[in-house]
Every structure is written in C-alpha cells, then in structure tokens.
Amino acid sequence: MNITVISVGKIKEKYFTAAIDEYSKRLSRFAKLNIIELADEKIPDNASEKEIEQIKEKEGNKILAKLPQNSFVVTLCIEGKEHSSEELAKKIADISMTSSHITFIIGGSLGLSDTVKSKSALRLSFGKMTLPHQLMRVVLLEQIYRAFKINNNESYHK
C-alpha cells in the first residue's frame, strides 16, 4: 500500500516534526509513506472573500499538480464525514481492495478549494473544531497507523 499525504504549510515546531517522524517510522511496516509539503500562500489582513477564494485556488492548483495518478483521494475538511478509528480502519481496508494508493489532502488555514474537494472520493472530518495543519498532520498519521494496527489484529492502546 502506498500512502501520500499532501499538506499545505510548513512544519515549524520540532515537537511536531518528531511526532511525524515517529509515526512515519511506525507506518513503514505497513505502507510506503510519502509526505508532500507545499508552501502556503500569504493571506493579507482583512482579505476579501474574492482574495480568499483566489488563495484557495492557488493552493489548490499546487495540490492538484502533486496528486498521484490513480490514487484514491481523501480530503480532510470540516464538512466531511466523521469516522471512528475502527470505521477508518475498515474504510482503508476496503479501499486497499480496489486501489494500491491512497492520498490524504490537508489544506491550508483557509481550507481547500472546491476544485480539490471535487477530486476526492472521500471527505473526512476529524470533528467540527479547527485544528492547525501541523497538528492535523500528526493526528492523521496516528490514525492511519492505528488503522493498520487494527486491520492487522495487533494491539494498540485505546
């Protein structure tokens, strides 16, 4: 299984980098992981709705340029469907029956463009709260790792 995570925004804190490295190492037993980090666009103070949409489109174009072909695309967005860890594990297992590559997309601070969302086969939400993209990357990798542990009937703390 190949897993790609495309994320807008740079990881700045060392503790997030350490957590991402740890989960990347753990995941290597189950899947080939590729993390693509894209620069976010500058957001002017008091940006208009039009400027916000233009920024989301620019970031979206960068995402689409990096999107692997023939990959099952999952976008992380607040309006997506919430899953328990067990449900996400089942979803990943089901996807692996028809696709050898899953791409998870994390948008920038303004979210994802409608164009990117339209490319997704699954819109996934981790709840209604807004989380920083740096933390979201850690949470996503932990949940993917947990899903593989569940799917392989291996114990993992609850």
Kindly label every feature range from the protein language model.
Residues M1-L27:
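N-terminal beta1-alpha1 ligand-phosphate binding loop
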Residues I6, N34-I36:
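General small-molecule cofactor/ligand-binding pocket signal
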Residues I11, I78-K81, G108-G111:
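Short glycine-rich anion-binding loops that position phosphate/pyrophosphate groups of nucleotides
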Residues S28-N34, S71:
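A generic structural motif
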Residues I35, V73-T75, R123:
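Conserved beta-strand scaffold positions in the cores of enzyme catalytic domains, especially
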Residues A39-S100:
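S-adenosyl-L-methionine/SAH cofactor-binding core of RNA-modifying enzymes
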Residues E86-G127:
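A mid-sequence interfacial segment
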Residues D114-K158:
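Structured adenosyl-cofactor binding patch, chiefly the S-adenosyl-L-methionine
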